[in-house]
Amino acid sequence: MEANLGMAGGPITFTPATIGEPVLRWRSRARSIEGIEQELSRIWTSPDLNRDLDGDKITDLRVAARTSVMNLVVIARRQEIGERCASTIQRLTGRHPSRTTILSSADPDGPSWLDAQIQAHCVLPRQDAAATCAETIYVTAGGEGGRHLDAIVAPLLIHDLPVTVWWPDEPPFGSQPANDLFEMADRLIVDGSGWRGTGLEQLRRMAALQERLPLAISDFALVRQSRWRETIASIFDIPNFLPYLRHLRRIAITYAVREDGGAETTNIVKPVYHAAWLASRLGMRVEKPLAPLASPVRPSAPRHGGAAPLATALRRGGAQLVAGGRIPVQAILAALDATEEDERETRVE
């Protein structure tokens, strides 16, 4: 590998890339919003980005101009979370390119500062095609800037493209900094299965957020259950079983609980989603609040702990669960799984 980097960084030349694999073609740094904007402009005006090194010969590349279908903003509490999300997003560059801004805050009570790394990854779909390239901006901000991340995000957005906020950790629903980010977004991506406690309070706050803002929400906890939903639905594709649907009056869901804290500290977001899906498909609604009910450990309980039935009293109604959206949530989830598999293989080696 040969890198052509000045003081602020710049294009990187590699030996020919593998078709379909993302390759780092640009890397630079900036210490202000204005500096980030200048580096983003430099990426697409640099003639060196269109060249590749093949032995001693420099050949022209067919590099597409900036290709983006959305703005993706990732709020990463820790550096390793941001890096994992970036690896996932880079896998999608060829199919779902985006301008990605990965934000981390540090030392909110100290002086205001900003440090940014600007990268461009390109994917060659086939030998005779133009490469698809997308930008990734890693921003760490401290002091006043770290408390107002929306002020950093706003000038870096590509206008007229949808904005998606991906919050891998537990979003602080109700806090003003988070609300400021939500207000500029079209979609929020979360993973409710990792929230503290039962997760019910966070679900309530998230539902209140959606009532207040025209914000679509995708939760990996719901997406991961798609095979369960398909399996249950396929049972009632059998004509002899279909009549039983009309006689369902009560649903009990049994799930694994934490060994160290029991049902009171076990996240039940996925069981709640499953109950909600069943209720929506059957035209039911919740008659009284959902709550975990303690039960003794049984020999047939899941291996991770005891069994706690989530009893839901449901009756006929008009509830409906709407899924879908403009962004490839399923594709992101698949890329996440692929990243985890690569990490496991690396550890084994």
Predicted stretch roles:
Residues M1-G174:
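An N-terminal, globular interaction/scaffold subdomain
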Residues E2, E21, E34-E39, E80-E83, ...:
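Glutamate identity and glutamate-enriched acidic tracts
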